[in-house]
Structure formats: C-alpha cells, structure tokens
Amino acid sequence: MQCGAACLAMIVNSYGVKCSLEYVSQMLHIGKNGVSMLAITEAANEIGFNCQGQLYTVEQLKEAQMPCILHWNQNHFVVLFKISKKEVFCIADPGKGLLKLTFEDFCRHWISTEQQGTRGTVLLLTPTEKLENFHIDKYHSNKSKHVLWKYILKYRYLYIMLLLGLFVGSLLQLVLPFLTQSIVDVGIKNQNIGFVWLILLGQLMLTISRTAIDFIRRWLLLHISLRINISLVSDFFIKLLKLPMSFFDTKLMGDLMQRMNDHSRVNTFLTQQTLNITFVIFTFVVFSLVLFFYNKLVFVIFLLGSILYGVWMTLFLKRRKVLDYELFEQQAINNNKTYEFITSMQEIKLQGCEQRRRWEWEDTQADLFGVQMKSLKLQQTQEAGSIFINEVKNIIITVVAATAVIHGQMTLGMMLAVQYIIGQLNSPVEQLMNFFYSLQDVKISLERINEIHQMDDENGKEGLQTSIEDKSEGIDIKNIMFKYDPHALRKTIDDVGIHIPQGKVTAIVGASGSGKTTLIRLMLGYYPVLEGKINIGNTDINKLNKKWWRRQCGVVMQDGVIFSESIARNIAVDDGDIDKERLLKAAEIACIKDYVMALPLKFNTKIGRDGVGLSQGQKQRILIARAVYKNPDYIFLDEATNSLDANNERSIVENLDKFYKGKTVVIVAHRLSTVKNADQIVVIDHGNVVEVGNHESLTAKRGAYYNLVKNQLELGN
C-alpha cells in the first residue's frame, strides 16, 4: 500500500534531498485502498517538482526524463531509473528491490490493457528550485536511534548486574582451555592421576559456578524483559489513544497487530541480544588474544576466514530488508483476512459464500507463502556460503595445528586447547553476524513504531483549552468544507453553515450518504475541517482539548461498541466508582432496566464477545444508557433508535424528550417519529444544506424534507 510513497521518496532522495518514507506517507494521506496518481502528483508538487501524467508508448518513454514513476500491473507503482542501449529497463520496485527487465517483460507489466496494448501510464517529475530549499528536519529526528536508551537507562542497575554476571561467566570459561592443556601436557604425559583428578575437580567447580551465575542471570533477564515489554507496549497504546481518528481510517487491523509484534522484536533485542553481544565481544577479544599467544599463523587464518564470513553475510543485508518489509505487509493482510473470516462467520453462512471467502483466504496464504519461499531461498544461499567458509577455515586450521605438533612447534595439549578456542570463537563470529541481522530487523521495527510516535497528536499545539467561552451561543458551524481524502475531487461536506442553538434539539436529516454522520464527527472533533470553522460557544473547536470536549458529550454512533464487560461497566465506562442511582436512572430512560433486572446477575452480567449475546435493539439501548449516564451538556445521537421496535422507540423518545431539557442535542435519524418534535430540522443533500426549519414549516413547504418523509405512516397519503 506504500508503493506510491516509496517511489516518490526514492526520486526525492535521488536528487540528493533527504526524505523519509514516513514523511511522504503523511503527505499522501494513504488510505486503506492505497494511493492515487493524483495524490502523488500533489505531494510531488508540494516537495518541489513539476509533474505531468502521460500515456506513453515505449518509444516515447525512452525520450522521457528519468527517474519517473510508472503505473505497474494496473495496481502498483515502480520507479524507472534508466533504459540501456540494449533495451534493458532498470526498475526500482518497492516490494522487490532493483530489477533489470527485458523489453518483453517490461511491456507485460507496464502496458495498460485499456490502451489496446500500446501505451502505459507514466508520471514525469521535473525538479524545480523549490526542491533545493526543501527541508524536513522535523521528520528526521534521531528518536528512532536513541529511543532504546530510555528503556535501558530505566533499568541500568539490573543491566549492570547482568553484565557483571556475563563477565564473570566468560572469565570462568576462559580458564577451561588452559585446564585442558594441563591435563594432556602434565597429567597424562607424566602419568599423574592425582593431578588429573585435581584439574577435573576444578572443572567441576567452574561448571557449578557458571550454572549458578546463568541461573541468576536468566531470572534477572526475565524480570527486565517483562518490565520493558509492558513499558514498550504501554507507551505505544498511550500514543495510539492520542492520535486522530483519521489515522485509524487509513490503517488495517492487521497492520496495527504487526506493529504490536514489532515491540516483541525490540524487547528481545533489548533484553537478550544487547547483553549477549557484550559477552560475545568480550569472549571474542579474550580468546583471540589467547589464540594469538598459542599460534600466530592459526590466528591469522582464523581472522581472514572470519572477515570473509562477515563480508559474505553482509552481501544479503539489503535484500533481507526488502523482504522483511514485503513480509510485514503480507502478514498484515493475512492477519486482517483471518480476523475478518472468523468474525464474519454468520454472514458468510447466511450468504452461502463459504467457498469464495475460503478461496480468498487461500490466495492470501499463497501470497504469504511466496514471500516466505523467497526468504527461505535467500537464507539457504546465505547459510550454504557461510557453512562452506567456516568448514574450509576449520580444516585449514586443523592441518596447520597438526603440522605444528608433528614438527614439535606445539604440544598435543596446546593443539586440543587451540581446537577448543576455535570452537569458542566460531560461535561469537556467528552471533556477531546474527546481532547485525537483529540490529537491522530492529531498525526496521523501530522505523515502523517510530512512524506512529512521530505523528502529531489530535490536540496539536492549540488544543489545550478545557473550558468553553459563552456556552449560551450554542454550536456555530461556519461555511465548512471537508473530504476524507484531501486529494479526492468530491467533497463530503461542502460550504455548510448551521447554527445549533444552546438548550435546543436540532435534527439533521437526509438521504443515506449525504454527510449527516460526517457532520456529527466533525462537531466531535474527529477530523479537522479543511475550510471554515466550528465554534463551541465562542471557542474554536481546534483550541479545545478533544478528550475534555468529548467528556462533555453523550454520544451514540451507528457503529457503537459493546465491551466484553459487565452491563454496569458498559454503561458507566469512565467512572472509577459506579453511581448506582445514576445507573438505574440511565437504564430506566433507555428502557433496558426490566431486561437487566430479570437476569440472574443483573447489572453484573457480562456481555460482549465473551459474554451474553444481545440483540441489536438491546445493544442500542445500552449505548443510549451509556450516553445518558454521563448526564452531559451536549448530546449527539446518530441513528440511535433505528434497531428498536415501534413501542420501545416511542417510550425511549418520550423519556429522552424529558432528559433533553436544558441540553444541546443533535439528532441524526431517518424516522419521522424521532425528528418531528425537534426545535430545528436541517436537511442535507450531497454535503450541502438545502433546508432549515421545523416539522410543520418544512412539511408545508413540500420540498426536500417532505420528499424524505412523505412515505412514512403519518404522511402516507
């Protein structure tokens, strides 16, 4: 989904301007359906390019300015950097890396099926002077580099204890090759069984000491690991709760779950690999010095072999990074598909689409398997080379050491000690390379986590106010314009101006998709308007602390959520101690009290996914009770009674009419019975206000409102 952002970032960086993928992604406002070429064009213009979208033949493309962005396979974007004289096309694919394609392969991916197989879509980008002055320092903080230190320093004393344990353990391990040499060169050579037993007893004591140290180290490691993991995930959740709703509109559930898994990777790196690498480096340095002391030639052979091993392993780093990103995206899609498959079981069975939905899931598994196969091939190639280099190095060292023993340059005990040291050094070299791999993986994970932490909170710098000036002025909506995708042509809300009087009931009606729910979301501060202004009293909504503002509101949305908790906790969601009197009153107004009191556990009955199942009408009544329990000054109801039967709806509407006294109420509804008693009715059509009045005046006018309600019972004839 980020292929468009990656392509634009690559082109910007190719001109020597540093630009992160996160920054470009924010400029593009990438949604769940990806990004359009129009969005890429507008973002590129802002950065400093003149853009031109064209339908070109391959011959025209050869004359075009490069790098340029190509529409690939009708659903993807890539960058074309160069076309050689032999017609080899150099492509940068965000999902696959650098590719060199033949003329036939290139045409198969690029040529549009809608252009009779002759042309493809290309976005040409010409740099301007604006690009040279483009700075994004704000988005190039070193936070992702030093964020780990916050957690390490927090538990620095425990880390110091662990490091001491590691150093003591490695020092004890250092004694072992000398003991091995002593057994062979002194005990066995002199046939001194007492000396052999003494050395073996020493080895036993060393083993017991190392085991005890390792036992304590593991407990400390578990303690630190749990604490850091909780801190990491908790900080992530705190940040998520501060983000605007627009963020959640653009992210798949699977994407967020994958970022949660990234925290486990970071936690493992912090608590295990950072400590182990300290131990590994210490072991490597000390044993290398001992090996140098025993035989300089063996040391040189080992060093050259290790360098060759390291060079071989680093050749795969860049490709592994590309595959990691590809695997991340595919796992996110897979998680999302699996979650949807399980939670939609009822609808799947009702519609009889079991086979098709299963095939869709299997297609996702096939795509995931394809990426995993590419990772496995890369890993096998890497391992085959590393094993070959290591084995050749070990064989050469064995030959050199054996030759030295034969020529009297080394004793047999020294040779055994050298073999032990080589065995101990091979592991640190491998662990060092694994550490660099883990470091690369953690950098990728930190980039993804940091992308969230660097996003602006929904309150921004202005939204700190926790009071409303001149509340009696009601809510004033002044010529606002809004669209969910800033790059879209169609406006969801267009030049809407409404005054919602304080202490009165205002109903918003209109056909489905006309913008009613969006208007409520804007009044709740879900999204900033693109033009115009919303005032609560005389206070700009952008200056209000959004969390504080929503606490002043009782809200029932169409997609309200029932938590897996007791009925009482579902109604009093934000209260530390539940006010039983308010709880009963709220349940009574919502006409849910009789149902609850008939249950064995009454208000302590658990509902939601893990509890008692509820009908849609019962869910709506609990959501209404939740809004009433807050006893707010502002109430927003979005189709709050559309799942209720006529009798229950009539009773609840009558109860709410009494509850509304002195409160500012905004209702979105289709049913006439819900809106006809409103003090003011606003009719919206395609994002525009077309009528304002009360039920009597609008009915008499026989305009848009009349056409909406005329088929309902009271106006049927």
Where are each of the predicted segments found?
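Cysteine-nucleophile protease catalytic domains, especially the papain-like/related folds used
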Residues: 1-53, 60-66, 72-74
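Noncatalytic regulatory segments and standalone regulatory/sensor domains
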Residues: 28-35, 41, 62-73, 77-165, ...
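Transmembrane helix-loop-helix hairpins at lipid-water interfaces of multipass membrane proteins
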Residues: 159-213, 220, 292-297, 408, ...
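Transmembrane helices of ABC transporter permease
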Residues: 199-210, 214, 276-325, 397-410, ...
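An intracellular "coupling" helix at the cytosolic face of ABC transporter transmembrane type-1 domains
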Residues: 245-246, 258-270, 274, 319-340, ...
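Cytosolic ends of transmembrane helices, especially the final helix of ABC transmembrane type-1 domains
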Residues: 330, 349-353, 377, 421-452
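ABC-type nucleotide-binding domain
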Residues: 468-717
